[in-house]
């Protein structure tokens, strides 16, 4: 027993010896910490509660009527109806005097602070009647105005920053297009290279390491490129892609530019939902913010073609905001019970939306003119399961793809709905004709894809079974029903990509990586059928001269890169790039030439052919000369390296002879070599003869 205790004691002493004295984590005397809390814990401090938390959603309404208790309920109903247009009201307090008479002001608490701010903007100085005009303020404004210093200090003068030319990329006399290539070099670290597509080989303009965390995106006119980072996003531009503006929105997942590049919308998650912020690109100022319950169709904003309006869909309504104030159009939403989707015309301030079937009332597609809110065309539809709105790029036509059913099956509680006997209609709206006539095309097969010709009057569809589908081309003309002009049968394709200039189309199977180039003006012949295994993207350049197919590392990890083709499908460049992420052509702004001037140039184009061909020959000759000079320089460099190594090899001969037993192995004759032939059995075959 004593022996056991002594063993335990020795074991405890050994364990105690393993634990040394704890280190001292205190700062040494005279230590000065140069790192502020904001730099060290900026992301956490941004979420700490402020003193105003809890009252920032409260508004104070002054100059309301002073009424007796008998009339108080009526006053409450009037004011609540007015203020509830801007959000959900949680609580209302009407202070009263000893006699029960209101004191002429009230406190209202909204569910969200943004709703309170909206109510202040819209209802401050609102005239209730000839004797009462509201004075509406945020509750937090009282403390803000109390802390205003009595002595005014002039603002500091900021130095003027000279900005580079943002449109230098269109000043190239030969109008070569630019593109960017992104490749991931490390987790959350993407390298981006910018290139100019010159002949005979593209020219590298700029390469940026660690340029973005995920991917990049061009603005609609090609002026800016946006990068994504943990604190927010940044836009770059100019000749060397300098930083133009940054927008602090942590965790931004997606951005969207307005068509004229005046505004930027950022979408990023928050602990309470999805935060959406609209920014002014030139000033970097936040114009408006929203909180949504997640990334859904309801949270997406859609812009008018001229940046004058931005709209989003709400529950049974459309919210249209005017720029630059971002107030609701006419200070109220457009109530549309049963709305399921909407889309702006790409060239006019016209909104198309569709409404689902309700209580034996048919579904409806409506065209509404903004800002007048005037309905210019309606189309009733029956037995509708879903609709998709497809505008032609020129705004000449609108196609509504209608998924229709023959029979509807519901369960007892109407929770599960099944559509049986599906077929499809294409409702074509002729936007440029009087009273906007509508034509209909019915297809009894499954529709896999739809695409308008950007410039022209044709559209194409993929229909049938997935593995053996058909591609049909229709032509739309004035006064006649859309006609089928060509059907290509048994085509294994999943997507359709029209050239931005029309005429040529790529039928792609992005599952197998096969492509077919079709000329729609030459009896729809297939000019080429290349393949690019595992290709996941197709990009036309803005002029319609080149097509790029890419295999992204987002899809696979091996053999990533991109191929470049002519518009007829001839391969001109293959690039294998490790961890390739994306390829994007730089968009071009619209031409400044009038339609008459463009027609004149096209008419006299033959006059310019000789000059263009001569310039191309000179460029190719110059390029060939430069290539020969480059090869000659490489050969000279190699021969210099080779001669240097031969000299080193000769200097080491004595050392080699000594190490090899005084045998000069550099000049061995074949007679001194013994050759031995060895045979061994590889396999044995037995053949039976009858």
UniProtKB/Swiss-Prot annotation:
Region (Disordered): 1-37
Molecular function via GO: RNA binding; translation initiation factor activity; translation initiation factor binding
Keyword presence, Coiled coil: yes
Record's subcellular location: Cytoplasm
Disulfide bonds: none
Gene Ontology annotations for the cellular component aspect, listed alphabetically: eukaryotic 43S preinitiation complex; eukaryotic 48S preinitiation complex; eukaryotic translation initiation factor 3 complex
Signal peptide: none
Domain RRM: 57-141
UniProt xrefs under Gene3D superfamilies: 3.30.70.330, YVTN repeat-like/Quinoprotein amine dehydrogenase (2.130.10.10)
PROSITE patterns named among the record's database cross-references: RRM
InterPro entries: EIF3B (IPR011400), eIF3B_RRM (IPR034363), Nucleotide-bd_a/b_plait_sf (IPR012677), RBD_domain_sf (IPR035979), RRM_dom (IPR000504), TIF_beta_prop-like (IPR013979), WD40/YVTN_repeat-like_dom_sf (IPR015943)
Subunit structure: Component of the eukaryotic translation initiation factor 3 (eIF-3) complex. The eIF-3 complex interacts with pix. Interacts with mxt.
PANTHER family the UniProt entry points to: EUKARYOTIC TRANSLATION INITIATION FACTOR 3 EIF3 -RELATED, EUKARYOTIC TRANSLATION INITIATION FACTOR 3 SUBUNIT B
Family, as annotated: Belongs to the eIF-3 subunit B family.
Protein name: Eukaryotic translation initiation factor 3 subunit B
Protein source organism: Drosophila sechellia
């Amino acid at each position: 027993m004593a022996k056991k205790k002594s063993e335990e004691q020795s074991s405890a002493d050994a364990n105690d010896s393993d634990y040394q004295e704890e280190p001292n984590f205190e700062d040494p005397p005279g230590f000065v910490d140069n790192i502020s809390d904001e730099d060290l814990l900026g992301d956490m401090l941004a979420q700490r509660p402020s003193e105003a938390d809890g009252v920032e959603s409260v508004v104070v309404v002054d100059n309301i009527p002073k009424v007796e208790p008998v009339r108080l309920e009526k006053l409450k109903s009037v004011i609540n109806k007015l203020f509830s247009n801007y959000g959900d009201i949680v609580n209302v307090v009407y202070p009263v005097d000893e006699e029960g008479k209101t004191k002429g002001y009230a406190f209202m608490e909204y569910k969200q602070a943004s709703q309170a701010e909206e109510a202040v903007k819209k209802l401050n100085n609102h005239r209730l009647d000839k004797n009462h005009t509201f004075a509406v303020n945020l509750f937090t404004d009282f403390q803000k105005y109390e802390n205003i210093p009595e002595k005014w200090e002039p603002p500091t003068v900021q130095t003027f920053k000279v900005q580079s030319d943002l449109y230098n990329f269109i000043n190239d006399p030969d109008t070569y297009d630019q593109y960017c290539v992104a490749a991931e070099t490390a987790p959350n670290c993407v390298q981006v290279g910018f290139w100019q597509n010159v002949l005979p080989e593209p020219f590298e303009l700029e390469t940026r390491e660690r340029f973005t965390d995920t991917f990049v995106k061009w603005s609609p006119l090609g002026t800016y490129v946006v990068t994504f980072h943990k604190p927010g996003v940044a836009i770059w531009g100019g000749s060397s892609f300098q930083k133009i503006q940054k927008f602090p929105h942590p965790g931004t997942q997606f951005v969207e530019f307005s068509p004229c590049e005046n505004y930027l919308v950022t979408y990023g998650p928050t602990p309470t939902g999805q935060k959406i912020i609209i920014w002014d690109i030139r000033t970097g100022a936040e114009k408006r913010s929203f909180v949504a319950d997640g990334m859904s169709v309801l949270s997406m904003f859609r812009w008018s073609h001229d940046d004058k309006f931005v709209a989003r869909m709400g529950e049974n309504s459309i919210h249209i905001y005017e720029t630059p104030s971002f107030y609701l159009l006419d200070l109220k939403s457009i109530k549309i019970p049963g709305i399921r989707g909407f889309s702006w015309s790409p060239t006019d301030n016209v909104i198309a939306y569709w409404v689902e079937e309700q209580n034996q009332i048919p579904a409806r597609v409506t065209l509404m003119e903004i800002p007048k809110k005037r309905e210019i065309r309606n189309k009733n539809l029956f037995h509708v399961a879903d609709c998709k709105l497809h505008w032609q790029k020129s705004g000449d036509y609108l196609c509504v793809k209608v998924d229709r059913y023959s029979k509807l099956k519901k369960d007892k509680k109407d929770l599960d709905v099944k559509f049986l006997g599906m077929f499809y209609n294409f409702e074509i709206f002729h936007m440029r004709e009087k009273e906007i006539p509508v034509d209909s095309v019915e297809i009894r097969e499954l529709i896999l894809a739809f695409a308008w010709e950007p410039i022209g009057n044709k559209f194409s569809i993929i229909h049938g079974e997935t593995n053996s589908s058909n591609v049909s081309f229709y032509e739309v003309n004035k006064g006649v029903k859309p006609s089928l002009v060509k059907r290509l049968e048994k085509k294994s394709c999943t997507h359709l990509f029209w050239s931005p200039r029309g005429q040529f189309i790529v039928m792609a199977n992005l599952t197998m990586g096969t492509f077919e180039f079709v000329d729609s003006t030459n009896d729809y012949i297939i000019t080429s059928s290349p393949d690019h295994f595992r290709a996941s993207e197709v990009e036309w350049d803005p002029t319609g001269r080149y097509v790029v197919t890419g295999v992204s590392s987002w899809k696979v990890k091996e053999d990533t890169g991109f191929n470049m083709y002519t518009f007829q499908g001839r391969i001109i460049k293959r690039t294998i790039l490790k961890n390739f992420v994306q390829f994007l052509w730089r968009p071009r702004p619209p031409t400044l030439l009038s339609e008459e001037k463009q027609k004149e140039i096209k008419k006299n184009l033959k006059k310019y052919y000789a000059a263009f061909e001569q310039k191309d020959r000179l460029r190719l000759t110059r390029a060939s000369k430069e290539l020969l000079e480059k090869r000659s320089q490489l050969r000279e460099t190699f021969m210099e390296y080779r001669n240097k190594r031969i000299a080193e090899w000769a200097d080491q001969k004595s050392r080699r002879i000594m190490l090899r037993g005084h045998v000069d192995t550099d000049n061995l004759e074949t007679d001194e070599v013994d050759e031995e032939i060895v045979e061994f059995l590889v396999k044995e075959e037995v053949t039976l003869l009858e």
